[in-house]
């Protein structure tokens, strides 16, 4: 079930918290060494799509927190309620104030200003190609890293000999069952 893997995601990334450590990388140059040090970005913006808003939130939230970041979540204006409900549940977990924040609104009036905010150091965006293009352009203005997943709608091939009713059912259930509507 979705609830099961979402819970497992939190446990998995909670187990990663103490795995982010530096390491010495050998160098062939005398008297020189390379050191890899993992550091949190600080504030990470998580911008969510309308379809599977909770699933996408967990995929983004758990690793961002495990890496030591604070987050600002911007759910889709078409599916904000499930995110807001999860936040009210997380408030009961006695998390530090300001660790997880939510802003709602449209991409142009809320998402773009969030991306361009000076305190936001990294963006994780899932949505359509038009929104992704605007998000990427805004992030590039401030030279901020952005991770994007754009327009995935479970494409499928349906062959001539396929059971059409079963195929249509599969296509629809690949997109809509956890959309937050």
PLM regions: where:
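Residue-level signal for inorganic ion chemistry
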Residues: 10, 68, 100, 123, ...
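Hydrophobic residues in well-ordered beta-strands that form the structural core
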Residues: 73, 79, 104, 147-148, ...
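A structured beta-alpha segment of the ubiquitous adenosine-cofactor-binding alpha/beta core
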Residues: 33-34, 101-124
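Short beta->alpha connector loops at strand-helix junctions that form conserved
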Residues: 69, 74-76, 104, 126, ...
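Conserved small-residue-rich beta-alpha loop and adjacent elements
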Residues: 23-97, 121, 143
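ALDH superfamily catalytic-core signature
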Residues: 122, 130-181
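Hydrophobic/aromatic ligand-binding patch that stacks against planar heteroaromatic rings
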Residues: 63-65, 114, 138
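Long amphipathic alpha-helix in the N-terminal Rossmann-like dinucleotide-binding domain
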Residues: 1-21
């Amino acid at each position: 079930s979705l609830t099961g893997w979402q819970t497992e995601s939190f446990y998995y990334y909670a187990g990663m918290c103490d795995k982010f450590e530096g390491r010495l990388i050998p160098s062939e140059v005398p008297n020189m060494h390379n050191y890899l040090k993992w550091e949190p970005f600080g504030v990470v913006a998580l911008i969510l799509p309308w379809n599977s808003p909770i699933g996408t939130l967990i995929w983004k939230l758990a690793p961002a927190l495990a890496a030591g970041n604070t987050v600002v979540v911007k759910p889709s204006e078409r599916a904000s309620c499930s995110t807001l409900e999860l936040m009210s549940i997380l408030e009961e977990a006695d998390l530090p104030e300001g660790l997880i924040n939510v802003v709602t609104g449209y991409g142009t009036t809320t998402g773009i200003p969030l991306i361009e905010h000076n305190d936001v150091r990294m963006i994780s965006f899932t949505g359509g190609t038009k929104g992704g293009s605007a998000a990427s352009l805004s992030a590039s203005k401030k030279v901020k890293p952005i991770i994007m997943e754009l327009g995935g709608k479970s494409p499928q091939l349906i062959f001539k000999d396929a059971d059409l009713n079963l195929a249509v059912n599969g296509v629809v259930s690949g997109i809509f069952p956890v959309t937050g509507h």
